[in-house]
A protein has these predicted regions:
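A general structural motif
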Residues: 37-43, 62-66, 84-87, 106-116
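Peripheral docking tails and interdomain loops at the edges
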Residues: 106-107, 112-183
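Glycine-rich phosphate/diphosphate-binding loops that line cofactor/substrate pockets in enzymes
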Residues: 46-58, 78-80, 118-124
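N-terminal active-site wall of soluble small-molecule enzyme domains
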Residues: 66-77, 91-94
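Short, small-residue-biased leader/transition segments that mark boundaries at the very start
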Residues: 1, 5-12
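Short internal beta-strands
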Residues: 59, 82-94
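Long hydrophobic segments that form regular secondary structure
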Residues: 17-58
Length: 183
């Protein structure tokens, strides 16, 4: 089974920052069970009311330590699933060096048009944005806040993003079973 802590960002009237940190405490928990990690994970996402788009436009902006083969495989899988990739300069350059097509968009501090403009316009379906350091976290606050307002699914870790993409194959196979069926 897979436990998932659910944070009520969509129901909250304040715009507290949804970035996960050590001080954040769980306000709810769901559990997904399945015969595989992918099935359990997708069920936990559904139980937490997290909308996972199956196609559309994904915004990618990842910190340098996440620019790995794992990230490249994730980008390739997104393209295979018919996602269009929009990325910040450093991420877009990294993808281009590895023959993965993406469109470039400014960070907020680089001027308009920037990523928050695209989120407001409804042009972004999924966000994968990993940050490192106080400045980077602060600079991406407006992205996270707008994602919450517009109900755009947002991942702040490469691991959760990869788990979600790995679980794609289970969208159509989700079934409800008794716990006794698993144990």
């Amino acid at each position: 089974h897979r436990d998932l802590h659910s944070f009520p960002t969509r129901r909250s009237s304040d715009l507290s920052d949804p970035v996960l940190g050590p001080e954040m405490k769980s306000t709810g928990e769901v559990m997904g069970t399945g015969s595989s990690f992918g099935e359990a994970y997708i069920k936990s996402q559904h139980a937490a009311d997290i909308k996972i788009p199956r196609t559309g436009t994904v915004f990618l902006s990842v910190r340098d330590p996440d620019k790995t083969e794992v990230f490249l495989n994730l980008a390739r899988l997104l393209i295979k699933k018919d996602f269009k990739i929009i990325a910040t300069e450093g991420t877009s350059d990294f993808l281009t060096r590895h023959n993965i097509n993406s469109s470039y968009i400014n960070k907020v501090h680089q001027g308009q048009p920037h990523i928050v403009d695209l989120i407001r316009e409804g042009a972004i379906d999924l966000i994968i944005n990993t940050t490192e350091g106080k400045q980077s976290i602060e600079e991406s606050f407006s992205i996270r806040a707008e994602a919450v307002i517009r109900d755009v699914t947002y991942y702040t870790s490469l691991e959760a993003s990869v788990a979600t993409m790995d679980a794609f194959d289970y969208f159509s196979m989700v079934s409800v079973n008794r716990l006794q069926d698993y144990y």
